[in-house]
Amino acid sequence: MQFQTTEQFSQVAAELLRHHYLAQLAGTYLANPDAQLACIHQGIQPFEAVNAVAREYGLPRMEIGLFGLSLASPDRPLIEDDQLNACERLGLFELLQDVPLYVERASA
């Protein structure tokens, strides 16, 4: 998945933080557009950047299960599929066009 703008990157990173950690992008170094641009140029995906933020700030990952919210295993980082789901929730389908994992999932 190739991000072209810091706006796209920050939208996805913010959604991952909100959905999986009940946290906000504001107050983290990922809120800085220069940091977002550096991630884009280095090929770092939002889920990878959010994993680093979660480790740095000691954020517990949350999961939604049958009985509501619960803590996820601390050694279970976000993966690409979590990012694909975030893009779908945000309606950023243009980012998903060339992602083999999404194309396979969408055609199933």
Where are the regions that the model predicts?
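C-terminal alpha-helical interaction appendages
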Residues: 1-108
